[in-house]
Amino acid sequence: MILVKDANINGKKQDLLVEGNIIKKIGNISISEVSKDETEIIDGKNCVLIPGLVNTHTHVPMSLFRGVADDIPLMEWLSGHIWPMESKLNEKIVYAGTLLGTIEMIKSGTTAFNDMYFFLDSIIKAVDETGIRSTIAYGMIDLFDEEKREKELKTAKESLEMIKNLNNSRITGALGPHAPYTCSKEILDSTNALAREYNVPIHIHMNETLDEINQVVEKTGIRPFEYLNSFGFFDNVNTICAHCVHLSDSEIQIMKEKNIFVAHNPVSNLKLASGVSPVLKLLENNISVTLGTDGCGSNNNMNLFEEIKAAALIHKGVNLNPVAVTAKEAFEFGTKNGAKALNINSGEIKEGKLADFVLINMKKPYLTPKENIESHLVYSFNGVVDTVVIDGKIVLNDGKMVNIDEEKVYELAEEAYLELAN
């Protein structure tokens, strides 16, 4: 058990008790009510306790790609830099990159993430060791080639079986077709069928740039969401669509009808000059917006608090509307909405929810005065957290990783980068 004493919880000084991996009780809890020998007691004095953040779109091993290709557009970034480096990937490199990325996420308050990448056994190994929660998809790209399509689907299905057989509630599977401009109708059809067979979500890039939209229009005569909807890609599945920057009214209507979850990546979209997602329109149509960092190659960090702030600010400016996205809405994008998208029973601090939460020391200049903490968490916090609990276990204590030797990870990451870069 874990007992947090005297923390600011939901705006009040309270205690919180964890039994197993569940928040059992919130309120005034005496130490005499629990067994001292079986309970870890956390002093929450001067701390605010918040739900863990949920990163709904990333490529965690790309922590090793941080800073390799800045200040260029997406297609040049992909074809000229990222894809050539990814051709050198191996299990050791992906393992090192995932360790580095998950440490970065945990130390900035993220307790769960939704990933699309390669060498899933290495990702799973690192996730298991760090203690973070994850939904993982093998990234499928067939480039309209039948032989490659069969290989990609085989690997995706094997990955789902591998994750299923882990029987680990922290690690769940998904299907990750890259995007409509890199995936054939056949692989997308098969993706929907597999998602229904395995009862897993689909994670796909959609409408990130004008160039990719034009590619789909030239090939099919209609826009990406219209194209996928024409053959039932969104039917009877939970779909998380990353980016969604350039959307027509008809596409927004499809998204609304099909209950699409949007993984909004404001920082990556700005850095690659892709554009700004019409989030206000999405909200007006009751479309659920969540937040992702994307990979470190296009961000260049995995601090979801930066995405929360960017989401709260950018739409005010673009729409000349100070309440386009409020601080409360932006915070829920990164917590409650993300948890719902990944079907995780978290995102709020309530009895019966999973014990995925974060403690932040408020004795910092940028978090003072403490009376305005809800505002500070969105507009002034830098993301450095003190304690992180995931699935009822302490994984970060006083800013230090509990399960992992950080110095060793940094050495592994430097070695892996040299192998990638040469």
Curated annotation (Swiss-Prot):
Please report the name of this protein according to its UniProt entry: 5'-deoxyadenosine deaminase
Question: Per the annotation, how and in what number is the cofactor bound?
Answer: Binds 1 zinc ion per subunit.
**Quaternary structure per UniProt?**
Homotetramer.
Binding residues for Zn(2+): H57, H59, H205, D294
A biological process term (GO) from this entry = S-adenosylmethionine biosynthetic process
Q: Which pathway does the record list?
A: Amino-acid biosynthesis; S-adenosyl-L-methionine biosynthesis
List residues binding substrate.
Answer: E86, H178, E208, D294
Q: Which GO terms describe its molecular function?
A: 5'-deoxyadenosine deaminase activity; 5'-methylthioadenosine deaminase activity; adenosine deaminase activity; metal ion binding; S-adenosylhomocysteine deaminase activity
Source species, domain of life: Archaea
Catalytically driven reaction(s): 5'-deoxyadenosine + H2O + H(+) = 5'-deoxyinosine + NH4(+); S-adenosyl-L-homocysteine + H2O + H(+) = S-inosyl-L-homocysteine + NH4(+); S-methyl-5'-thioadenosine + H2O + H(+) = S-methyl-5'-thioinosine + NH4(+); adenosine + H2O + H(+) = inosine + NH4(+)
Its keywords, alphabetically, are:
Hydrolase, Metal-binding, Zinc
Report which gene this protein is encoded by. Answer: dadD
Might you give the EC number(s) for this enzyme?
3.5.4.41, 3.5.4.31, 3.5.4.4, 3.5.4.28
- Co-factor requirement: Zn(2+)
Family note? Belongs to the metallo-dependent hydrolases superfamily. MTA/SAH deaminase family.
- HAMAP family found in the cross-reference section: MTA_SAH_deamin (MF_01281)
Leftover remarks? SAH is a product of SAM methyltransferases and is known to be a feedback inhibitor of these enzymes. As a result of this inhibition, organisms have evolved efficient enzymes to metabolize SAH via different pathways. The pathway found in methanogens differs from the canonical pathway, it uses the deamination of S-adenosyl-L-homocysteine to form S-inosyl-L-homocysteine for the regeneration of SAM from S-adenosyl-L-homocysteine. 5'-deoxyadenosine is a radical SAM enzyme reaction product which strongly inhibits radical SAM enzymes.
What is the annotated role of this protein in its UniProt record? Catalyzes the deamination of three SAM-derived enzymatic products, namely 5'-deoxyadenosine, S-adenosyl-L-homocysteine, and 5'-methylthioadenosine, to produce the inosine analogs. Can also deaminate adenosine. The preferred substrate for this enzyme is 5'-deoxyadenosine, but all these substrates are efficiently deaminated. Likely functions in a S-adenosyl-L-methionine (SAM) recycling pathway from S-adenosyl-L-homocysteine (SAH) produced from SAM-dependent methylation reactions.
Q: Which Pfam families match?
A: Amidohydro_1
Q: Name the enzyme group at the top EC level.
A: hydrolase
